Every structure is written in C-alpha cells, then in structure tokens.
C-alpha cells in the first residue's frame, strides 16, 4: 500500500503515483477514504503483476466479507466503497511517470494544492 495524497486536490499527483507503480511492474488499484485530519485521501494497493492483475486485486477486495474482530473502523462495505471514485475522477490525458530526474510528482503536487483552494 502506498499513501498517495489527495485524489481530490492533487488528482494528477495521485494518478502519477499509480502510473509510476504500474511502470515499475506492479498491478496497482486506487482507493480512497476520508482521513479526519486530511480530508479525502488516496492510496494505491499493489502487487507484482506476475501474481495478480488489477481486476484480480479489485475482485479480491470486493469479496472480503469478514474481518478480524475488534476493528474499530474498517468494515467490508467500507472496503468496497473505497474502490469507487466519482465520475471522471480517475480520468487524465497525461501519461508521464515520476522519476528521480523528472520530478513530475512534485510538480503536480504543487500545481494541485495551488489550484485546489
């Protein structure tokens, strides 16, 4: 799991993280939840593409129907809901990834917060 900034305020940064993970050979699926101190916050869950593809990861998460006793927040319906994004929230025309040399992630992060408020 990779915490990945706000998919609302810094959408391009969020999507760049996913593209970068995928370019490194991972199958990656986005999810999000509300974090009290941050608002809507995004994450990517990933595994080696040789083990699972994105559809298989999503299917496994959607099939979770029971969790360990004693959890105070996480529920199976919350897991399923966290995989759903609003219309066009994951759409972009950009295809670039982040590298040490490109700094695209930092650029998109700053751009998002500058225009997000």
For the regions a language model picked out, list residue spans one by one.
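Conserved beta-strand signature within the Rossmann-like core of class I S-adenosyl-L-methionine
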Residues: 1-4
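Conserved Class I S-adenosyl-L-methionine
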Residues: 11-31
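Soluble small-group transferase modules, centered on the S-adenosyl donor enzyme superfamily
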Residues: 30-117
């Amino acid at each position: 799991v990779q915490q990945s900034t706000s998919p609302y305020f810094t959408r391009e940064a969020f999507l760049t993280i996913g593209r970068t993970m995928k370019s490194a050979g991972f199958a990656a699926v986005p999810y999000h939840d509300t974090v009290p101190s941050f608002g809507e916050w995004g994450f990517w869950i990933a595994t080696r593409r040789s083990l699972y593809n994105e559809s298989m990861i999503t299917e496994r998460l959607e099939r979770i129907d029971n969790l360990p006793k004693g959890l105070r927040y996480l529920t199976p319906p919350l897991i399923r809901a966290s995989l759903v994004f609003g219309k066009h929230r994951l759409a972009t025309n950009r295809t670039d990834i982040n590298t040490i040399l490109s700094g695209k992630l930092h650029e998109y992060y700053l751009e998002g917060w500058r225009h997000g408020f």
